[in-house]
Amino acid sequence: SYNTKNFIDGQGTIRGVKNGFVLESDQNNSGLAIYVDNAAAVVDHCWFRGAWFDPQTVVWDNIRYGRIADKRPVKGVAPGASVYVPLTLQPGETKTVKVNFCWYLPDSNLSIGGARKVGQAFTGMPCKGTASGQQPVSGFVGKQLLNSFDRGGDGLTGIIQSPEFNIGKRYLKFLVGGGSQADRTSVNLVVDGKIVETAVGNQTETLSETVWDLKPYQGKKAFVKVIDLDVYPWGHILADQFVLTDNRNEDIYNLSSTSTLLADFESNSWGDWQVVDSSEEEKQFLADEGDVEATYRPWYSERFKSLNEVIGYWDANQAMLEKNSRLFSDAFYSSSLPAEVLEAVAANLTILKSPTVLRQWDGRFWAWEGCQDSFGSCHGSCTHVWNYAQALPHLFPSLERTLRETEFRVSQNTEGHQNFRVNLPISAPPHNFHAAADGQLGGIMKVYREWRISGDTQWMKDLFPAVKKSLDYCIRTWDPLHKGYLEEPHHNTYDIEFWGPDGMCTSFYLGALTAFIEMGKELKQPVKEYTALLSKGKKYMETALFDGEYFIQKIQWEGLQAPNPVDVMSFGGSYSEEALKLLKEEGPKYQYGTGCLSDGILGMWMASVCGLDEVLDNEKVRSHLVAVHKYNLKHDLIDHFNPQRPVYACGKDGGLLLCTWPKGGMLSLPFVYSNEVWTGIEYQVASHLMMKGEVEKGLDIVRECRERYDGRVRNPFNEIECGHWYARAMASYGMLQGLTGVRYDAVDKTMYIDSKIGDFKSFISTDTGFGTIEWKAGKPVLNVVYGNIDVKRYNVSGKIVD
């Protein structure tokens, strides 16, 4: 038997389908169909209706005593359903009953940045801290605060204001956090009908103190106006503890008797604060956003019009779909590559079948970084995380190309700034935060990769103007003096900004310049300026940033075009009195300086997996990777101190630390996450080591990683970072190329092979087909099992073989 609660819709019905049942949603002809391939099936369409555990108790009795309940569908809510298949088996006989699942829910309430619920941000009552789906909120006083994220996330908008008060004290102090746009998410002081003071958050959920000097407004009447007119990421505002005082140093958490508390939001209502009509003020933003669907609709909602169509398609095509799936599986597992590598690659392909990935109605791909238990983790196909993921561009190249199209046509503005996260449904995001240096520069390399994988030069040509604008923005923003390296503060995958040149992001810069030059040459575009930058950057990387063993960071925060770090917007980058002291002694928070960073040459790995030559000295790159293995790989972590997220690897676990300081120089506050272990970084280092001929060192890292995910403590098919099925883990796919050097170039029809393990047999997937590739007794052997792969020549370790 197969038995299930009615989990689709608590108020939905259960109806019949041939040899099974449908958990029906409240929408017409949609839901989940569950049915078997046996005509003898008997269906209980409605479990016992009762309270508490009554339904489960009765159905379990039926199961354990072998009773078959035959019950027709009922009107109204049904708590669950069962399908039974009576069987008679002789001793030693087996029979298989296939259970089919067909899912069709064409609509959702999921949106990030696109849907707008006008005037609903401040309904109900003040928030009791952190709202559902929100990062932890801290820094407020008492048990409640004003939090416009509370009742629906960033999609809610509204305005709330205080009663009018007389300005008789010198200062107004309060706490603020959340979004940072003065015209969209802010706390404002209104005097004589005009906004005279404004405070915003710093794109962090930690509230910080703001002080307004009221001397110019003494004797006048005023009110506080809090606005949330933004539906994009960080489209919310946090505020708490509004206090009038004559003491600028008033302790806002322990008020004196001479202060006046204007609002603390500790009651079960807004009290005398009033929600006001925001519709007029929102018109300008509504006009800017254009016509975008309010909520996400999946791709299949356009292909199929009903659940019955899905069932019909599955019944007609399941044999073909299973056959092709087995072709893939058989080809993949026929490989002779090390077992730990195959396991790491295969296990992480589950990410592509997890809730981490979505495909909207028009076919465009969109993804979270990972998944929390009940919602997505970190939205928007984040460029600096999906940089690492190498499975999708090879297995489903056309889907990967939609990511590039979104990045350069939707997420990029006219200045070339890319938001590294995009809305859902896909639409133009705001440009109210830093671009991500590694994400934006990595995207340029990935345009080159998608061109070589697809062979579609016209596609590359169409994107090239936007790619140029993107690269020019990067140069103008992070290398304004054209030195060839990133000097100005640059945001990256560690959710912070590196100040001064570093190996990780400057290697991305060199890789992006290389990709742009190659594409420019193909299109006969001028690239002289970029070639000069590449030459200067290469020289600087190999000298100033190489300490003789590995690449480092030169921390710099003075003499830049950027303002003081205290004044620069940053996640969690606010500077307390203690942090200001550290700034003077060590420089900005969250740097790595002389550390040995596992990602310290990441841009060169990206270049290789994108089909580009690594422009840096090969021996220096190899030296860096060997140093990472030497210093950062730990075979147990008993003595390792990790104040961040130790659950990724702890105790007797082994793993590759993100950074160590073997030669001293560790900062008091190094970059966040530096003590952690991330599987995606383990795999990129391992595959890069393999490319450099250091196969055993690479396998050493892979073994430590997969031993943590052996099923005893952690799920072998769910490598976690900031969420389950975390996309960065698909860096594991790069190990196929790392061991074999196998890469197909569809532009010039060349199959590349550069084996680091002698003879081998490996899986190969291209835009037009998949199969296996062998290097055997000095000869390449290609076996295409699906589609076709048009190979004109082989390039074997740099030598052409027709």
Stretches with model-predicted labels:
Residues 83-85, 143-168, 207-211:
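Short beta-strands within extracellular/lumenal beta-sheet-rich domains
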Residues 2-91, 283:
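Trp/Gly-enriched beta-strand surface patches
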